Regions:
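Active-site-adjacent structural elements that line small-molecule/cofactor binding pockets in enzymes
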Residues: 1-179
Length: 179
């Protein structure tokens, strides 16, 4: 099978037209997936005379988890920095704009040009974090991923830009497989 990854509408539409599946970038929110990505894939499929049947979507999600408040906070800091890094990229601005956060992209881009990488993460509010990431205790992750994406994706790829206990991920993956 051939898959393409993307964020922008044109690449996404091309993937719908010529591929067997699409890999959503981690910098994709549920709203962006439903309102931009899936319609673009459907347009591409229609151009090729195909439906979405059998087409696979690999869904995105940052995951912020830990067994206590200190672990959750450490995970949140790493994830905020990664979201900020992606958010500084002008090509990804439409994702932020969809949520009314276009001005945050301007600030992130300016800070990136100044080399202020750590400061960038402080611009990612709790609202932004919770929009891009599933945040919670390990037992809350699989149900929330399923709630957000279970009806529109066939596979999930999650991103956790921080170190943590491998056993925690085993539990999350087992819960996802049984969901």
């Amino acid at each position: 099978k051939i898959f393409l990854a993307g964020v922008g509408e044109l690449m996404t539409e091309v993937a719908g037209e010529v591929c067997d599946g699409f890999i959503c970038h981690g910098f994709t929110t549920e709203k962006y997936l439903r309102e931009v990505t899936i319609p673009a894939l459907e347009r591409g499929r229609a151009k090729a005379g195909k439906t979405m049947e059998g087409f696979e979507i690999v869904g995105p999600s940052f995951v912020v988890t830990g067994n206590n408040e200190a672990e959750l906070e450490r995970a949140a800091v790493g994830t905020r920095k990664q979201i900020a890094f992606y958010g500084s990229t002008p090509a990804y601005r439409p994702v932020l704009e969809m949520h009314g956060w276009g001005e945050v992209q301007d600030q992130l881009n300016a800070l990136s040009k100044q080399g202020e990488w750590d400061k960038m993460g402080t611009l990612i509010t709790d609202e932004i974090l919770n929009t891009f990431a599933v945040v919670g205790l390990p037992e809350q992750i699989a149900p929330e991923l399923n709630h957000r994406y279970g009806d529109v994706i066939q596979r999930i790829s999650f991103y956790a830009p921080y170190s943590s206990d491998p056993e925690r991920w085993s539990k999350v993956m087992s819960a996802l497989q049984s969901a």
